[in-house]
Amino acid sequence: QVHRGPVQHACYPHRAEAIVDSGKFDWNAHADKFPGLTTPDESYHGVTYTERFGLEGAFITKATVQLMRDLGSIPSPNNCFLLNIGLETLPLRMKKHCENAQAVAEYLQGHEKIAWVQYAGLPGDKYHERAQKYLPNGTCGVVIFGVKGGRAAAEKFMAGLKLASIATHVADAKTCVLHPASSTHRQMTDEELAAAGVSPDLVRFSVGIEDAKDIIADLEQALANV
């Protein structure tokens, strides 16, 4: 998996005719929620908009019956102002996110207490060639990895971080960390976690735009106590 935003993804050279970005990530350096068009909407008896209304009608139907209902017909002036402010620095921030994430992935890959690292910017990653082709402006800012020792070790590592914030969202200007098995996926059994691809040792690390040396130093001191 690769978390990628509109800055990294070279859509048009690969025959994309139109690009729609939700603004969920990256735009203003903070996270928000934009429900998908291909997932069931429980507020309307589980309807999936793309299946019910087709590709041409899905977006406008969802925008009318759900988003306009919940959020109003247009963003508030203040939200538009904040998004515009964020867009002014979007290329600079995304470049830093990607550079820092690459440095973090390379550091973790060689650490004795890390079992595995998944980041498409690493030459050995199974998605590396695709990232090189489709993400010429940088891979992404999210690194996932496993801490040796399983769930207990992963939780202890996360609790020992001082710079990174424990948070469920990604693509924030600050570094955020999450242990899915004990948080977002805690309601699942071990069998369900395995089926979902969430191992007990998995840590999701959303790399911010702080100095890379500070981020790595935080990782180092937290891993030293595991």
Task: Give the predicted meaning of each segment.
Residues 93, 152, 159-160, 175-226:
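PLP-dependent enzyme catalytic core of the Aspartate aminotransferase-like
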Residues 1:
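Catalytic PLP-binding core of fold-type I/II PLP enzymes
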Residues 5-142, 146-176:
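Active-site C-terminal subdomain of aminotransferase-like
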